[in-house]
Amino acid sequence: MSSIKIECVLRENYRCGESPVWEEASKCLLFVDIPSKTVCRWDSISNRVQRVGVDAPVSSVALRQSGGYVATIGTKFCALNWEDQSVFILAMVDEDKKNNRFNDGKVDPAGRYFAGTMAEETAPAVLERHQGSLYSLFPDHSVKKYFDQVDISNGLDWSLDHKIFYYIDSLSYTVDAFDYDLPTGQISNRRTVYKMEKDEQIPDGMCIDVEGKLWVACYNGGRVIRLDPETGKRLQTVKLPVDKTTSCCFGGKDYSEMYVTCARDGMSAEGLLRQPDAGNIFKITGLGVKGIAPYSYAG
Protein backbone atom coordinates (compact mmCIF):
# COMPACT_ATOMS: atom_id res chain seq x y z
CA MET A 1 0.00 0.00 0.00
CA SER A 2 1.51 3.32 -1.03
CA SER A 3 1.56 6.09 1.54
CA ILE A 4 -1.24 8.61 1.10
CA LYS A 5 -0.34 12.29 1.08
CA ILE A 6 -2.88 15.11 1.41
CA GLU A 7 -1.74 18.54 0.29
CA CYS A 8 -3.59 21.86 0.18
CA VAL A 9 -2.75 23.16 -3.31
CA LEU A 10 -4.97 26.23 -3.50
CA ARG A 11 -5.71 28.51 -0.55
CA GLU A 12 -8.53 30.73 -1.73
CA ASN A 13 -11.20 29.95 0.90
CA TYR A 14 -14.01 29.35 -1.57
CA ARG A 15 -17.51 29.59 -0.12
CA CYS A 16 -18.63 26.36 -1.77
CA GLY A 17 -16.11 24.82 -4.16
CA GLU A 18 -17.65 22.12 -6.36
CA SER A 19 -17.48 20.19 -9.63
CA PRO A 20 -13.73 19.65 -10.05
CA VAL A 21 -12.76 18.57 -13.60
CA TRP A 22 -9.24 17.94 -14.88
CA GLU A 23 -8.40 19.38 -18.30
CA GLU A 24 -5.39 17.40 -19.49
CA ALA A 25 -4.63 19.64 -22.50
CA SER A 26 -3.95 22.64 -20.27
CA LYS A 27 -2.93 20.74 -17.10
CA CYS A 28 -5.63 22.77 -15.36
CA LEU A 29 -8.26 21.97 -12.73
CA LEU A 30 -11.63 23.51 -13.45
CA PHE A 31 -14.15 23.97 -10.65
CA VAL A 32 -16.88 26.34 -9.50
CA ASP A 33 -17.65 28.39 -6.41
CA ILE A 34 -21.43 28.12 -6.40
CA PRO A 35 -22.62 31.11 -4.29
CA SER A 36 -19.84 33.37 -5.59
CA LYS A 37 -21.16 32.76 -9.14
CA THR A 38 -17.64 32.00 -10.33
CA VAL A 39 -16.03 29.42 -12.62
CA CYS A 40 -12.35 28.92 -11.75
CA ARG A 41 -9.42 27.41 -13.61
CA TRP A 42 -6.26 26.57 -11.65
CA ASP A 43 -3.09 26.05 -13.65
CA SER A 44 -1.19 23.25 -11.90
CA ILE A 45 2.09 24.33 -13.53
CA SER A 46 2.05 28.10 -12.90
CA ASN A 47 -0.19 27.83 -9.79
CA ARG A 48 -2.26 30.71 -11.14
CA VAL A 49 -6.05 30.90 -10.92
CA GLN A 50 -8.25 32.46 -13.58
CA ARG A 51 -11.90 33.26 -12.89
CA VAL A 52 -15.01 34.00 -14.90
CA GLY A 53 -17.96 35.57 -13.09
CA VAL A 54 -21.50 34.72 -14.19
CA ASP A 55 -24.97 36.08 -13.39
CA ALA A 56 -26.34 33.31 -11.15
CA PRO A 57 -25.10 30.48 -8.90
CA VAL A 58 -22.93 28.20 -11.06
CA SER A 59 -23.01 24.61 -9.89
CA SER A 60 -21.03 22.56 -12.40
CA VAL A 61 -18.62 22.92 -15.29
CA ALA A 62 -17.55 20.43 -17.97
CA LEU A 63 -15.32 20.21 -21.02
CA ARG A 64 -16.75 20.75 -24.51
CA GLN A 65 -15.55 18.88 -27.60
CA SER A 66 -15.78 21.95 -29.83
CA GLY A 67 -13.71 24.05 -27.42
CA GLY A 68 -14.46 26.06 -24.33
CA TYR A 69 -16.70 24.67 -21.62
CA VAL A 70 -20.30 24.07 -20.63
CA ALA A 71 -21.73 24.99 -17.25
CA THR A 72 -24.96 24.89 -15.28
CA ILE A 73 -25.84 28.44 -14.23
CA GLY A 74 -29.04 29.05 -12.28
CA THR A 75 -31.49 26.79 -14.14
CA LYS A 76 -29.71 27.17 -17.48
CA PHE A 77 -27.43 24.86 -19.43
CA CYS A 78 -24.82 27.25 -20.86
CA ALA A 79 -21.79 27.34 -23.13
CA LEU A 80 -18.82 29.26 -21.73
CA ASN A 81 -16.14 30.82 -23.92
CA TRP A 82 -13.13 31.21 -21.65
CA GLU A 83 -11.18 33.58 -23.91
CA ASP A 84 -13.78 36.36 -24.01
CA GLN A 85 -15.68 35.25 -20.87
CA SER A 86 -18.95 35.11 -22.81
CA VAL A 87 -21.85 32.90 -21.78
CA PHE A 88 -24.43 31.55 -24.23
CA ILE A 89 -27.64 29.86 -23.07
CA LEU A 90 -28.18 26.42 -24.63
CA ALA A 91 -31.35 25.40 -22.74
CA MET A 92 -33.44 26.22 -19.68
CA VAL A 93 -35.26 23.97 -17.18
CA ASP A 94 -37.58 24.32 -14.17
CA GLU A 95 -38.96 27.60 -15.50
CA ASP A 96 -42.05 27.13 -13.32
CA LYS A 97 -39.88 26.83 -10.17
CA LYS A 98 -38.36 30.25 -9.56
CA ASN A 99 -36.63 29.12 -6.36
CA ASN A 100 -34.71 26.28 -8.04
CA ARG A 101 -31.16 26.06 -9.31
CA PHE A 102 -28.99 23.39 -10.84
CA ASN A 103 -26.56 21.47 -8.67
CA ASP A 104 -23.95 18.89 -9.69
CA GLY A 105 -23.48 17.90 -13.33
CA LYS A 106 -21.27 15.67 -15.48
CA VAL A 107 -20.96 14.52 -19.09
CA ASP A 108 -21.76 10.91 -19.99
CA PRO A 109 -19.64 8.71 -22.32
CA ALA A 110 -21.84 9.69 -25.30
CA GLY A 111 -21.31 13.41 -24.74
CA ARG A 112 -24.61 14.26 -23.03
CA TYR A 113 -24.46 16.74 -20.11
CA PHE A 114 -26.36 15.38 -17.11
CA ALA A 115 -27.32 17.70 -14.25
CA GLY A 116 -30.01 17.90 -11.61
CA THR A 117 -31.80 20.67 -9.80
CA MET A 118 -32.76 21.52 -6.23
CA ALA A 119 -34.48 24.30 -4.32
CA GLU A 120 -32.25 27.14 -3.13
CA GLU A 121 -30.99 26.46 0.39
CA THR A 122 -31.82 28.69 3.36
CA ALA A 123 -28.75 27.19 5.07
CA PRO A 124 -26.42 24.41 3.90
CA ALA A 125 -28.55 21.28 3.28
CA VAL A 126 -31.69 23.11 4.54
CA LEU A 127 -34.25 23.59 1.77
CA GLU A 128 -37.76 22.85 0.53
CA ARG A 129 -37.68 19.16 -0.28
CA HIS A 130 -38.68 17.21 -3.42
CA GLN A 131 -38.40 20.26 -5.71
CA GLY A 132 -35.59 19.02 -7.96
CA SER A 133 -35.35 16.90 -11.11
CA LEU A 134 -32.64 15.14 -13.10
CA TYR A 135 -32.03 16.27 -16.69
CA SER A 136 -29.62 15.77 -19.54
CA LEU A 137 -28.68 18.12 -22.34
CA PHE A 138 -28.26 16.18 -25.58
CA PRO A 139 -25.71 17.25 -28.22
CA ASP A 140 -28.53 18.82 -30.29
CA HIS A 141 -29.37 21.02 -27.24
CA SER A 142 -32.63 19.19 -26.55
CA VAL A 143 -33.29 18.39 -22.89
CA LYS A 144 -34.53 15.13 -21.43
CA LYS A 145 -36.11 15.00 -17.96
CA TYR A 146 -35.64 11.67 -16.18
CA PHE A 147 -37.48 12.06 -12.88
CA ASP A 148 -38.53 14.63 -10.29
CA GLN A 149 -39.08 14.63 -6.50
CA VAL A 150 -35.33 15.15 -5.97
CA ASP A 151 -34.03 16.85 -2.82
CA ILE A 152 -30.39 17.71 -3.62
CA SER A 153 -29.29 16.31 -6.97
CA ASN A 154 -25.64 15.50 -6.57
CA GLY A 155 -22.78 13.15 -7.53
CA LEU A 156 -23.03 11.15 -10.74
CA ASP A 157 -20.88 8.89 -12.89
CA TRP A 158 -21.02 5.86 -15.20
CA SER A 159 -19.60 2.35 -14.91
CA LEU A 160 -16.56 1.49 -17.00
CA ASP A 161 -18.68 -0.58 -19.41
CA HIS A 162 -21.19 2.32 -19.63
CA LYS A 163 -24.07 0.02 -18.63
CA ILE A 164 -24.71 1.50 -15.17
CA PHE A 165 -25.42 5.10 -14.14
CA TYR A 166 -24.55 5.98 -10.53
CA TYR A 167 -26.38 8.83 -8.85
CA ILE A 168 -26.67 10.58 -5.49
CA ASP A 169 -29.68 12.47 -4.14
CA SER A 170 -27.94 13.72 -1.02
CA LEU A 171 -30.78 13.64 1.51
CA SER A 172 -31.52 9.99 0.73
CA TYR A 173 -28.08 9.24 2.27
CA THR A 174 -27.51 6.60 -0.40
CA VAL A 175 -25.61 5.99 -3.61
CA ASP A 176 -28.02 4.64 -6.22
CA ALA A 177 -27.54 2.80 -9.51
CA PHE A 178 -29.63 2.57 -12.68
CA ASP A 179 -29.34 0.37 -15.74
CA TYR A 180 -28.01 2.66 -18.47
CA ASP A 181 -28.57 2.47 -22.21
CA LEU A 182 -25.75 4.48 -23.74
CA PRO A 183 -27.17 4.86 -27.29
CA THR A 184 -30.43 6.42 -26.06
CA GLY A 185 -29.44 7.80 -22.65
CA GLN A 186 -32.35 5.93 -21.04
CA ILE A 187 -32.16 4.89 -17.38
CA SER A 188 -34.17 2.22 -15.57
CA ASN A 189 -34.24 -0.16 -12.60
CA ARG A 190 -33.18 2.17 -9.79
CA ARG A 191 -31.62 0.49 -6.75
CA THR A 192 -29.39 1.42 -3.82
CA VAL A 193 -25.78 0.24 -3.89
CA TYR A 194 -24.53 1.95 -0.71
CA LYS A 195 -26.15 3.36 2.42
CA MET A 196 -24.10 6.01 4.23
CA GLU A 197 -22.86 5.32 7.75
CA LYS A 198 -23.84 7.94 10.34
CA ASP A 199 -20.35 9.40 10.69
CA GLU A 200 -19.98 9.66 6.91
CA GLN A 201 -22.75 12.26 6.93
CA ILE A 202 -24.11 13.57 3.59
CA PRO A 203 -23.04 12.06 0.23
CA ASP A 204 -22.03 14.81 -2.19
CA GLY A 205 -19.85 14.64 -5.32
CA MET A 206 -18.60 11.35 -6.79
CA CYS A 207 -16.15 9.91 -9.31
CA ILE A 208 -15.06 6.47 -10.53
CA ASP A 209 -11.60 4.88 -10.74
CA VAL A 210 -10.06 2.48 -13.28
CA GLU A 211 -11.12 -0.49 -11.15
CA GLY A 212 -14.78 0.54 -11.32
CA LYS A 213 -14.93 1.59 -7.68
CA LEU A 214 -16.69 4.79 -6.63
CA TRP A 215 -15.21 7.66 -4.62
CA VAL A 216 -17.73 9.79 -2.73
CA ALA A 217 -17.05 13.10 -0.99
CA CYS A 218 -18.84 13.23 2.37
CA TYR A 219 -20.21 16.68 3.20
CA ASN A 220 -19.87 17.38 6.95
CA GLY A 221 -17.97 14.07 7.14
CA GLY A 222 -14.56 15.48 6.25
CA ARG A 223 -13.58 12.54 4.06
CA VAL A 224 -13.77 10.77 0.75
CA ILE A 225 -14.74 7.11 0.79
CA ARG A 226 -14.09 4.40 -1.77
CA LEU A 227 -17.00 2.03 -2.40
CA ASP A 228 -17.48 -1.22 -4.26
CA PRO A 229 -20.86 -0.76 -5.98
CA GLU A 230 -21.14 -4.50 -6.63
CA THR A 231 -20.81 -5.60 -2.99
CA GLY A 232 -22.06 -2.42 -1.30
CA LYS A 233 -18.96 -2.40 0.90
CA ARG A 234 -16.77 0.56 1.81
CA LEU A 235 -13.17 -0.26 0.88
CA GLN A 236 -11.29 2.82 2.05
CA THR A 237 -11.67 6.10 3.94
CA VAL A 238 -9.41 9.11 3.43
CA LYS A 239 -9.94 11.85 6.02
CA LEU A 240 -9.20 15.49 5.24
CA PRO A 241 -8.48 18.40 7.63
CA VAL A 242 -11.83 20.03 6.78
CA ASP A 243 -15.41 18.88 7.42
CA LYS A 244 -17.27 20.20 4.39
CA THR A 245 -15.76 18.08 1.62
CA THR A 246 -17.97 18.54 -1.44
CA SER A 247 -16.60 16.71 -4.49
CA CYS A 248 -13.66 14.85 -5.98
CA CYS A 249 -12.08 14.01 -9.32
CA PHE A 250 -8.94 12.35 -10.61
CA GLY A 251 -6.36 14.37 -12.52
CA GLY A 252 -2.68 15.13 -12.78
CA LYS A 253 -0.12 12.71 -14.14
CA ASP A 254 -1.95 9.71 -15.67
CA TYR A 255 -4.99 10.65 -13.55
CA SER A 256 -3.14 9.31 -10.50
CA GLU A 257 -3.93 12.30 -8.27
CA MET A 258 -7.27 13.09 -6.65
CA TYR A 259 -8.48 16.66 -6.29
CA VAL A 260 -11.04 17.47 -3.60
CA THR A 261 -13.16 20.61 -3.29
CA CYS A 262 -14.76 21.80 -0.08
CA ALA A 263 -16.90 24.56 1.39
CA ARG A 264 -16.86 27.08 4.22
CA ASP A 265 -20.39 28.54 4.02
CA GLY A 266 -22.39 27.71 7.14
CA MET A 267 -19.35 27.36 9.40
CA SER A 268 -19.12 29.30 12.65
CA ALA A 269 -16.25 31.70 13.40
CA GLU A 270 -14.96 29.11 15.85
CA GLY A 271 -15.17 26.38 13.22
CA LEU A 272 -13.25 28.49 10.73
CA LEU A 273 -10.52 29.11 13.31
CA ARG A 274 -10.30 25.37 13.89
CA GLN A 275 -10.28 24.60 10.16
CA PRO A 276 -8.41 27.44 8.41
CA ASP A 277 -8.24 25.39 5.19
CA ALA A 278 -12.03 25.22 4.85
CA GLY A 279 -12.97 26.16 1.29
CA ASN A 280 -9.56 25.32 -0.16
CA ILE A 281 -8.58 22.78 -2.84
CA PHE A 282 -6.76 19.59 -1.83
CA LYS A 283 -4.67 17.09 -3.76
CA ILE A 284 -4.39 13.47 -2.60
CA THR A 285 -1.55 11.32 -3.90
CA GLY A 286 -0.51 7.76 -3.14
CA LEU A 287 -4.00 6.27 -3.42
CA GLY A 288 -2.60 3.41 -5.50
CA VAL A 289 -5.36 3.66 -8.09
CA LYS A 290 -5.97 5.95 -11.06
CA GLY A 291 -9.05 7.61 -12.43
CA ILE A 292 -10.32 8.02 -15.97
CA ALA A 293 -10.41 11.12 -18.16
CA PRO A 294 -13.62 13.17 -18.02
CA TYR A 295 -15.94 13.07 -21.03
CA SER A 296 -16.62 16.21 -23.08
CA TYR A 297 -20.01 17.59 -24.11
CA ALA A 298 -20.62 16.78 -27.78
CA GLY A 299 -22.86 19.75 -28.63
Curated annotation (Swiss-Prot):
GO terms for cellular component: cytoplasm; nucleus. It is found in: Cytoplasm. The modification Phosphoserine is found at residue 268. This is Regucalcin. It is an enzyme of class 3 (hydrolase). It catalyses: D-glucono-1,5-lactone + H2O = D-gluconate + H(+). PANTHER family: REGUCALCIN. InterPro entries: 6-blade_b-propeller_TolB-like, Regucalcin, SGL, SMP-30. Monomer. A divalent metal cation binds at residues 18, 154, 204. The active site is at 204 (proton donor/acceptor). It comes from Rattus norvegicus (Rat). Gluconolactonase with low activity towards other sugar lactones, including gulonolactone and galactonolactone. Catalyzes a key step in ascorbic acid (vitamin C) biosynthesis. Can also hydrolyze diisopropyl phosphorofluoridate and phenylacetate (in vitro). Calcium-binding protein. Modulates Ca(2+) signaling, and Ca(2+)-dependent cellular processes and enzyme activities. Substrate binds at residues 101, 103, 121. GO terms for biological process: intracellular calcium ion homeostasis; kidney development; L-ascorbic acid biosynthetic process; liver development; liver regeneration; negative regulation of apoptotic process; negative regulation of bone development; negative regulation of DNA biosynthetic process. The N-terminus is blocked.
